[in-house]
Swiss-Prot record:
Belongs to the DIF1/spd1 family. GO terms for biological process: protein localization. Residues 1-41, 108-132 are annotated as: Disordered. The keyword Cytoplasm applies. Residues 108-123 have a biased composition (Basic and acidic residues). The gene is DIF1. Keywords: Cytoplasm, Nucleus, Phosphoprotein. The keyword Lyase does not apply. Residues 16-31 have a biased composition (Low complexity). This is Damage-regulated import facilitator 1. It comes from Saccharomyces cerevisiae (strain JAY291) (Baker's yeast). GO terms for cellular component: cytoplasm; nucleus. PANTHER family: DAMAGE-REGULATED IMPORT FACILITATOR 1, DAMAGE-REGULATED IMPORT FACILITATOR 1-RELATED. Phosphorylated by DUN1 in response to DNA damage which leads to its degradation. One of its GO terms (molecular function) is ribonucleoside-diphosphate reductase inhibitor activity.
Length: 132
């Protein structure tokens, strides 16, 4: 009898051990599956971009893809849009203000009274730069 009791008592922990091992294997398989899914996310994203988002999910219906479903709100958002005319080139530029100085016209070289020798010198310098 003692041998039978020992044998019966030894079976219970073995069964529990086997069940635990099976559960651990199932959990490990699930973890491996999830790891594989995570490792391929980047590749799947690149594939979807390459396909141009052409794949359709089961939740996408044909009615949502029909052009008649898209509503045109342009007349509500910007009613009777008209372009404003650009200013003419003949008008004076805006007034320039710098601390205490004011000017109503754009500056030009004529106002600086540039002498002819200075202009010739500038042309000579520009010509020598071109040769380099």
């Amino acid at each position: 009898m003692d041998a039978q009791l020992e044998w019966a008592s030894s079976l219970v922990p073995k069964r529990q051990l086997q069940q635990q091992q099976q559960q651990e294997q199932q959990q490990q398989q699930q973890q491996d599956f999830h790891k594989d899914q995570l490792m391929t996310v980047g590749m799947r994203i690149r594939q979807r971009v390459d396909q141009g988002y052409a794949s359709r999910t089961p939740s996408t219906s044909d009615a949502s893809l029909q052009p008649g479903v898209i509503r045109d709100y342009s007349s509500v958002i910007v009613p009777q849009f008209t372009r404003s005319p650009l200013p003419t080139a003949n008008s004076l530029p805006p007034m320039l203000i710098n601390q205490r100085t004011m000017s109503t016209e754009a500056s030009s070289l004529e106002k600086w009274d540039v002498a002819e020798p200075a202009a010739e010198h500038e042309a000579m310098v520009n010509g020598s730069k071109r040769r380099l």
